[in-house]
Amino acid sequence: MQALVNRLWYDRQAGVHWLLVLLLLPLSGLFYLLTSLRRQLFRLGLKASARLDVPVIVVGNITVGGSGKTPTVIYLIELLRRNGYRPGVISRGYGVEFSGCKRVIAGMPANEVGDEPAMIVARTQVPMVIGSDRVAAGKALMDWQAVDVIISDDGLQHYRLKRDIEILVLDGKRRFGNGLLLPAGPLREGRWRQGRVDFTLVNGEGSGPEEFEMALAPGNWRSVADGQVVTANVDKSHESVAIAGIGNPQRFFDTLSEIGVQPSGQHAFDDHQAYSLEAIETVAAGRGVLMTEKDAVKCREFAKSNWWYLPVDAKIAPEFEQQLLTLLKRRENVQQGN
């Protein structure tokens, strides 16, 4: 199913699949009307929005699927800490059923808090609260920890929470796909939305004017079971299979090729896939397993000794850092009435 959707949205040579796109256009029109109405209700104050007592940085995208938001959030946490801030993070907690707000503590299973929150906290130990209501999550976070700036992960379309800085993350290769709104295309909002954000980060090739190029730099292979750095050659003459349950699995497979790792097979799972030992062993068929860090947080409890994950770090131009920090200070002064 995911392969078909990718062809519909991103393959310009999809041929007959464009017939299906045409059939979906009326639904995209309805989606446009509903989302436009919702935005206008917030803009006119007919739907309530709220501002928190600390600056809010929203990281998001306008397309469905992976673009590099999670590495960007981790990058921002580290950047803010280096510059004397005490950041916290709020997120939805995709795929997890709970009411109200929930604190994310390092070591909590991904099936209780979501794979991306589990990964962010495991990597950074940042204070984090998840909840469908970002305003409530932000207030719960401030009640819990003395944070002085909040990062809202994947919160671009959550207009109930007023924000001070918006950062759009784009996949450089896919960009806006066929340029159509859901479900005929991958867009949550029109391309016009890019012009309203403060910064656009382009993950990979193809950054344009007023865009900052971002690269995901692979780190050292680590054991899924205990997180220890692996010094041995994980490829072992093609005796491994690569798996990925992320928004854009091909990006992970391409990264392996770029660093000279050539597994004997690869398998793309759905984004936010709930893994089991049986499911992975069926794909692995006795071979070692290579996976992303996001996959690893869901497999740690039953991982085997020959399962490894590859962490990545976002690398962004220094000009972005300086412009972001300058804008943050300016927005802080406005909020404090200086």
From Swiss-Prot:
Highest taxon of the lineage: Bacteria
Pathway where it operates: Glycolipid biosynthesis; lipid IV(A) biosynthesis; lipid IV(A) from (3R)-3-hydroxytetradecanoyl-[acyl-carrier-protein] and UDP-N-acetyl-alpha-D-glucosamine: step 6/6
UniProt-annotated binding residues for ATP: T63, V64, G65, G66, S67, G68, K69, T70
Catalytic activity of the protein: a lipid A disaccharide + ATP = a lipid IVA + ADP + H(+)
SUPFAM superfamilies: P-loop containing nucleoside triphosphate hydrolases (SSF52540)
Keyword ATP-binding recorded: yes
EC number: 2.7.1.130
UniProt-listed InterPro entries: LpxK (IPR003758), P-loop_NTPase (IPR027417)
HAMAP family associated with the record: LpxK
Physiological role: Transfers the gamma-phosphate of ATP to the 4'-position of a tetraacyldisaccharide 1-phosphate intermediate (termed DS-1-P) to form tetraacyldisaccharide 1,4'-bis-phosphate (lipid IVA).
Family per record: Belongs to the LpxK family.
Name of the protein: Tetraacyldisaccharide 4'-kinase
Organism for this UniProt entry: Shewanella loihica (strain ATCC BAA-1088 / PV-4)
Lineage, broadest ranks: Bacteria, Pseudomonadati, Pseudomonadota, Gammaproteobacteria, Alteromonadales
